[in-house]
Each structure stands twice: as C-alpha cells, then as structure tokens.
A protein has these predicted regions:
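N-terminal ligand-binding/catalytic initiation module
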Residues: 1-62, 69-71, 78-81
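Short helix-loop-beta connector
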Residues: 77-84, 106, 168-169
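N-terminal Rossmann-fold NAD(P) dinucleotide-binding loop
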Residues: 94-95
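Rossmann-fold NAD(P)-binding glycine/threonine-rich loop
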Residues: 167-169, 176-221
Length: 221
C-alpha cells in the first residue's frame, strides 16, 4: 500500500509525563482524496503510567515539528542572504517547510518540482493564494537546484533525485524525506562532496537516512 506506521516514545527525566506517538504515512492517499500523514499522541503519567490525554492531531503536530526542524537547520546553516528556495515534493511537507522557512529567511521566490506535474501545478495554484511570494513550477529537479540557494527535499523517494554534479557553491540542502532505510533522495556522492554534512543524529542517519546509503556505497566511513 506504499505506506508505513511508526511508534515513538519520549521522556525527559524529571517531567511528570511522557509521550508515545503513533504516526503513519501512506503516500498514495492523495489519490484517494486523503492526507498522506495521520496519527495521534498519547500522554501518560510518569509515576503511574496512567493515561492523561489523547491528542488526536491526525499527524499535524508531527508535520509542524518536521517543518520547524527544517527551518532551524536553514536558519543556522544557510546563507542569511538567501532569497530563493527550491522544493522537491508537492505534499503537505512541501507547504509546511516553505511556510516555516519564511519565518527565518526573506524568501522572494520558491521553485517547486515533483514527479507528478499535475500535483505540482495544483500545489503552486493553491499556495499562491496563501503566501505572498513568487511560486514557480519547474520542469526538472536539475532546474530547481540551478535556480535555488536553499533546497528542501521532502519526498518518500527510494531512489536519488538530486545528483552530485548539480551541487554549486553556497547551496544549502535540507534533506527531510529519508527517514527509513530504503528511502534515498540524494545521490550518495553528495555526502562525500559537500563541504559540511550535519545530521540531526549521526547514529540514526547512518542506519536510516542519507548517510546510510553513502556508507553502503563505500564513499564515507
């Protein structure tokens, strides 16, 4: 069904509660008129394990958290003068990543590409009414990279979309999509060729993220 479900838990020592999240991503759902992401969060008492609350957010909090993580990366790692962004993907994360980026960078133009040109055009049409910047659909991922100072990839792709030969001086890439072992948006050679590779968790990305594919290809240790 081209989908996945993930269960994650979090606890900070000393807090009176801990949380468990169940999140799903079923990437053919838009064809059925349904959102691709869904889920809920459960809050429990740290001392007793008793249920305190159920947050039926349907994946919204996960989407917001992911978008904010991308914006934080761009804020601290991209050129502060960047005014153009390229987005690979045309789903909910594409929208939320763009909205979050606008909080930290003075973006004037966004270039959008996805494998489904119809979906790309629909995305561009819908978001133009909500965001007061230029939104332009691109014909290829290479064109998107060439026009961009910041590039955000947010797809469930299992094969590389962005090639290493497209890299250019000053380009910042926020790669959001590869959150499972089989997912891969970037040519593994990019990890070797870039000036800096900064993962949120190296131990995690060496197994599940883009770093995993570069290690398997023998490009990095």
């Amino acid at each position: 069904y081209h989908g996945e479900s993930d269960v994650k838990a979090a606890y900070i020592d000393g807090l009176d509660s801990y949380a468990i999240k169940v999140a799903s991503g079923f990437f053919n759902n838009p064809n059925l008129g349904l959102p691709s992401s869904n889920g809920l969060m459960i809050l429990l008492d740290s001392k007793t394990g008793m249920l305190k609350s159920v947050l039926l957010d349907k994946g919204y909090l996960t989407d917001v958290r992911t978008a904010i993580a991308g914006a934080i990366a761009a804020k601290h790692l991209s050129n502060p003068e960047s005014s153009n962004v390229g987005i690979i993907g045309a789903g909910i994360q594409a929208k939320m990543q763009l909205e979050a980026l606008l909080l930290v960078r003075n973006i004037k133009t966004a270039y959008i590409w996805s494998r489904d040109s119809k979906k790309t055009n629909t995305f561009v049409k819908n978001i133009k009414d909500k965001i007061n910047i230029k939104i332009i659909a691109c014909e290829s991922p290479e064109q998107t990279v060439n026009l961009s100072e910041i590039l955000i990839t947010c797809t469930p792709s299992k094969s590389p979309i962005i090639k290493s030969e497209w890299l250019k001086k000053g380009l910042h890439i926020t790669a959001m999509g590869s959150d499972a072992e089989m997912k891969n948006e970037l040519d593994p050679k990019i990890i070797k060729d870039c000036d800096y590779y900064i993962p949120d968790s190296q131990s995690q990305t060496s197994i599940l993220g883009e770093l995993n594919h570069a290690i398997k290809a023998g490009l990095v240790l």
